[in-house]
Amino acid sequence: MTVVAISQSNYLPWKGYFQLIANADVFVFYDVADFTKRDWRSRNKIIGPGGFQWMTIPVGSNRGKSIQEVQLPEGQWRSNHLETVRRNYAKAPHIEDVLDIISPVYNDLSINTLSDFNQSLIRRF
């Protein structure tokens, strides 16, 4: 029997998301679904010395658009998010390895949709 898993792409997903992918024979990103503001597609929480902190990609409401249609904004959010990860996990084991994995996606300005950005991050792991 073939195991198929289908999910919307998430921004910096939790461990269980990767377990879902690993346990499936076929994984499908379902990014034709409607984008919903203030959801895991464009934000996530990280924990640092000061407690939980939201990291949100400022994409706006994008009412009526699918996840794959949401355009990434210009601005400093990419470098700010990388710096937030670096600062909050500076003393964590393997932080440099993690930054080596995710930095190319954050630095690639040709990735201009939320769906492509999230999928690129997920595929790097």
Indicate where each model-derived feature is located.
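Residues lining hydrophobic/aromatic ligand-binding pockets adjacent to catalytic sites
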Residues: 1-124
